[in-house]
Swiss-Prot record:
Top EC class, one word: hydrolase
GO CC aspect terms: cytoplasm; ribonuclease H2 complex
Main subcellular location of this protein, as a coarse class: cytoplasm
Protein name, UniProt field: Ribonuclease HII
Lineage: Bacteria, Bacillati, Bacillota, Bacilli, Bacillales
């Protein structure tokens, strides 16, 4: 008895490798519906394979440390919120567990919101340790954004429940005695930094969404404090509030 296209599609969707797909008995079924199902499954498997290869590439710096220090406890550190006109800069320090596998990890700005939230939940539940560090708008104005970012990163490290032995940091160096590697675009090159990027992004977005409940005119739940048209118009109409960065333009010129 010939299987229906629906039944064949179910079999095809259970295939886990391209090689298995090409050797499957259904591969020779010439019905258009079957061939379409095969094409869809191939595309999905190719995408998954690309994510796996990307993930392996992004473990390079972790593996280099582990070659020399097999028992190393590696902490990835990243921040979000250097550019907005309002709100804190938020850093996250993340120590992945030894059997980590979070396909789709990348620079948080490149990850779709739904996937970002999914990864964030998995990371919070499964990593060895994580902690956030915040530098306020007042501290940004007092020290400058670069120094405030360093402060936020160190606070995140200090908040960890597990002491790391090595640091992987996105494009920054810290006044810290631990061995550290600073990576330009580290959130796209290291799984540890990418994990910290995701977690910091979700934390700060949530913070700004909560802030928008007290200050709805600025649209923080949509712009996260960046200088969008709505945000700038609100500044013109009602002025600034305590979490605006007074050292940033155009706010600085308004004071």
């Amino acid at each position: 008895m010939t299987l229906t296209i629906k039944e064949v599609t179910q079999l095809i969707n259970a295939v886990n490798t391209i090689e298995e797909l090409e050797n499957h008995e259904c591969f020779l079924d010439e019905r258009k519906g079957v061939q379409n199902a095969i094409a869809r499954r191939r595309k999905a498997l190719e995408k998954e394979q690309a994510l796996k290869e990307k993930y392996v590439e992004m473990t390079y710096f972790e593996n280099e440390i582990l070659k020399e220090h097999p028992n190393a406890i590696i902490c990835g550190i990243d921040e979000v919120g250097r550019g907005p006109l309002a709100g804190p800069v938020v850093a996250c320090a993340t120590i992945l567990n030894s059997n980590h596998n979070y396909l789709g990890l990348d620079d948080s700005k490149k990850v779709p919101v739904t996937k970002r939230l999914e990864l964030n939940e998995a990371l919070k539940n499964e990593v060895t340790a994580f902690a956030y560090g915040i530098a306020t708008a007042e501290e940004i104005d007092e020290f400058n954004i670069y120094k405030a970012t360093q402060i936020a990163m160190q606070r995140a490290i200090d908040g960890l429940s597990v002491q790391p032995t090595h640091l992987l940091i996105d494009a920054m160096t810290l006044d810290n005695a631990l061995p550290q590697v600073s990576l330009i675009k580290g959130d796209a090159r290291s799984v540890s930094i990418a994990a910290a990027s995701i977690m910091a992004k979700v934390f700060r977005d949530d913070y700004m969404t909560q802030l928008s409940k007290d200050y709805p005119e600025y649209g923080f739940e949509k712009n996260a404090g960046y200088g969008t048209k709505q945000h700038l118009l609100a500044i013109d109409d009602i002025g600034i509030m305590k979490e605006h960065r007074k050292s940033f333009e155009p706010i600085k010129s308004l004071l």
